Amino acid sequence: MSLRNWFSQLDKEHQSSIDYKKYKPIWADIRTSNYCNLQCNMCSQADSSQIQSFVKKNTHMSKYFRQVAAGNNLDINIDIDFSNLKFLKLAGGEPTIDPYCIAFLDKFIKKYDASKVELIITTNATRIKNFFDKYKSKFKSLTVILSIDAVDEVYNLIRFPANWNTVKHNVDQLCTMKEININLNFVIQPYNILVADQWLHFISKFVKDRPKTKIDFLNCINPKHFSIDAMPDSAKQFVTDMLKTSEKNFPNIRKKISELQTIVTNSSYKQDYHAILVDHLHDISKIRNIDYIKTIPEFKYLL
């Protein structure tokens, strides 16, 4: 369970005994709903309404997603005084298109002085223009955390039904807004680590253009079949060799590449995780009518 989920559950259990009007937070981490336009393989029904819909139509696929309670993490109506707020963090779902999130922001701006608040938003960057055109001038500063995970065909697989070319165009447009801080998130899993050299090239160029960019590599541990533990030793050896080459090719992000090497080194092969991973690859290929093993040659190391 994520920290945000844990606090939401705690709220539900103790809501009646807490007088929220006494508190004036300076930091708020808000997730209004699971409304989302993607069905990323490492997410859950609680994270994405698209996954909810997908699982309803393909019930046999539910076993591959992270097993948490379906629905919204936050379904409470609390009267909180945000007058002292300095940092507002928004996540989803996809907050840039979530009508609940937009309604919350509109209400917040109307009631409080948003020019004193730093807005931090995590987004998949699929539909961001209207959101940032509307809100970027309202807040003291804006930090955008881009959930990327990969590029090209592997991006399209992991973050289905998003298209990398469209997202890359949106990110390029976002980068022209120098007043916006941009950070990158990558959830490390077998599908993307096998082509790490491709997205490390993207990161290397990105950091050259925006040196203050923060890069976060989040090691996927749930679902377990999307952890690096699901990779056979031959696949990990391929990745290890590739990362050594990447260190030479992208010296400006050598420390970040070292983090990936540590993730691979610290993993321990689990045959049962591997079997489920391969089953997922075959099942998702069949459902989408895309032979990912042929489309992405590096996936042969997973078989």
Predicted regions: what is each one?
Residues 1-68, 80-82, 253-303:
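N-terminal pre-core extensions flanking Radical SAM catalytic domains
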Residues 8-13, 70-72, 104, 127-129:
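Short amphipathic alpha-helical surface micro-motifs
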Residues 23-35, 46-72, 83-99, 111-130, ...:
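Core AdoMet radical
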Residues 40, 102-109, 172, 200-204:
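Non-transmembrane alpha-helical segments in soluble domains
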Residues 76-79, 108-114, 134-137, 175-177, ...:
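Alpha-helix termini
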Residues 102-106, 129-136, 195-199:
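Distinct, well-ordered alpha-helical segments
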Residues 120, 140-145, 165-302:
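Conserved C-terminal portion of the radical SAM core fold
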